[in-house]
Swiss-Prot record:
It comes from Drosophila melanogaster. Strongly basic protein that binds directly to retroviral RNA and may be involved in its packaging and in the reverse transcription process. It is found in: Virion. Residues 1-27, 272-351, 358-377 are annotated as: Disordered. Residues 1-17, 272-284 have a biased composition (Polar residues). This is Retrovirus-related Gag polyprotein from transposon HMS-Beagle. Signal peptide: none annotated. Keywords: Transposable element, Virion. The keyword Disulfide bond does not apply. The gene is gag. It comes from the Eukaryota.
Length: 467
């Protein structure tokens, strides 16, 4: 019975028959070389030693020779149908611009590499040409100047090599690896900060690997190797018991190692907090607190006694001071406490202030400028003396009142023509008013003309008479 499923029967494993080897096709006699294993190994090693340095040098020293590279064009079979030329995918439009920042070059290049790898089957189509043209327009600033200075064609590999030469990390991968291996956690550094330092160096190494020209399998292997080295650096550089605890957990990568560290730190903190709280509660239950002495003065963290407080500059209630005498001494016998040290009484606030604080410095008065005499025009000067503007002559004298108000004084009877019996009361009052005005006007004219020519004594008599 035939075996329809082509399954190897168990009897085939138990039999002693061995499969017949296939027929060997030997080389002709003129091409056959007898060589031992040692000679073959030496030949392979010699070949690798000759070829490998050239490959490494070519990989590290990227020469911008694009003589064999031309612009990407549309294939002839698609030139009659350019409907897909403007149909650029949104994922390509969402790529951010690159202006020449070296810190952003690694991530930007990886995002473009993923897109270009996805649309590789569309090479030569109008759609691929539109995608490549959109990516070229995303390169602006100094990066655009670098591409134009080398006349880089419209090809992504050529543009990637030029940008890598200008904006990739100039340190070789060996230097970056050594710098990462020397990292340790500082005394005042937290676990999160140390993890951030290790991850930053790992990112630099991975960006350098991404800029190298290698196959995808090689890049994946190198990336995995450096991730393991970063994890080993993080575990070895931790302080305390964390390295031994992480060795038991065996984390797979850096994020899981950080998770275990934070978890162990939180557990240690809770255990220490509970232990300290239990010790404090037992101490309070067994022993009674010792009362402080009467003259106890608190001390600071360094064990030194703090100076007594300084009174305010302007207290609301100043204590009485009896001619600089100190306060009366307090009672020295204390019955409630033991042999407490006696501290002498404090002096008054004024002496204490002078002891702990320097006396205030007097304010320096700013020198005032000397007054300058006023310029007087000689043409307006006069020799006439104005006694009204001499204030020094009126010292110890009665204040003068120049605002003279006339008072209607009763005048003596004046004989008038005509019969007085025939004049009415209104006419008499009008006549008296006119007579008084004439007298006042005469006195004012006399005063205006003669008061300036009188001496001080005569002027006082006249003014007294007018009052």
């Amino acid at each position: 019975m035939a075996n329809p499923n082509n399954i190897i029967r168990p009897s085939a494993f138990s039999s002693n028959e061995r499969p017949v080897p296939s027929e060997r096709h030997d080389l002709p006699e003129q091409h056959r070389v007898d060589m031992s294993v040692e000679q073959l190994t030496a030949l392979i090693g010699q070949t690798v030693a000759q070829v490998l340095p050239g490959l490494i040098k070519q990989m590290n020293n990227n020469t911008l020779d694009f003589t064999d590279v031309s612009d990407q064009v549309v294939e002839p079979e698609y030139r009659n149908n350019l409907a897909d030329f403007d149909r650029v995918p949104d994922i390509v439009k969402s790529i951010r611009e690159f202006s020449g920042n070296p810190a952003e070059f690694g991530s930007w290049k990886k995002s473009v590499d993923r897109i270009m790898e996805t649309y590789t089957p569309f090479v030569g189509t109008p759609k691929y040409y539109g995608i490549l043209h959109t990516i070229r327009n995303k390169i602006v600033g100094s990066a655009d100047v670098a591409l134009e200075s080398y006349s880089i064609p419209l090809d992504w590999k050529a543009m990637s090599r030029c940008l890598t030469l200008h904006y990739a990390d100039k340190r070789d991968i060996t230097t970056l690896e050594y710098q990462m291996s020397t990292l340790v956690q500082g005394h005042q550094q937290s676990v999160e900060d140390f993890h951030q330092d290790v991850y930053k160096n790992l990112s630099l190494i991975l960006n350098k690997v991404g800029c190298m020209q290698m196959s995808r399998e090689s890049e994946h292997f190198v990336t995995k190797m450096y991730r393991e080295k970063a994890l080993d650096t993080f575990i070895r550089g931790l302080r305390g018991d964390l390295p031994r605890l992480l060795a038991i957990k065996e984390p797979a990568d850096l994020p899981s190692a950080l998770h275990y560290c934070l978890k162990l730190e939180n557990q240690t903190f809770r255990s220490n907090h509970a232990a300290n709280k239990g010790q404090q509660s037992s101490f309070r239950g067994n022993e009674k607190p010792i009362p402080a002495p009467r003259n106890f003065q608190p001390s600071n963290a360094f064990g030194h006694r703090q100076p007594p407080p300084v009174p305010p500059r302007h207290p609301m209630r100043r204590p009485p001071q009896y001619l600089g005498q100190p306060f009366p001494a307090p009672r020295q016998h204390v019955s409630n406490f033991g042999n407490a040290p006696f501290i002498p009484p404090r002096q008054n606030y004024q002496q204490q202030w002078q002891q702990y604080n320097a006396p205030p410095r007097p304010f320096a008065t700013k020198p005032q400028p000397r007054p300058e005499p006023m310029d007087v025009d000689g043409s307006v000067q006069t020799r006439n003396i104005n006694y009204m503007n001499r204030p020094h002559s009126d010292i110890n004298k009665r204040q003068k009142n120049y605002n003279i108000q006339t008072v209607n004084m009763r005048q003596p009877s004046i004989e008038v023509t005509g019969s007085s019996s025939s004049m009415t009361g209104y006419q008499r009052s009008m006549q008296d008013y006119e007579t008084q005005n004439n007298i006042n006007s005469t006195l004012n004219e006399y005063c205006d003309g003669q008061i300036d020519n009188l001496d001080s004594e005569q002027r006082d008599h006249v003014l007294h008479f007018l009052e």
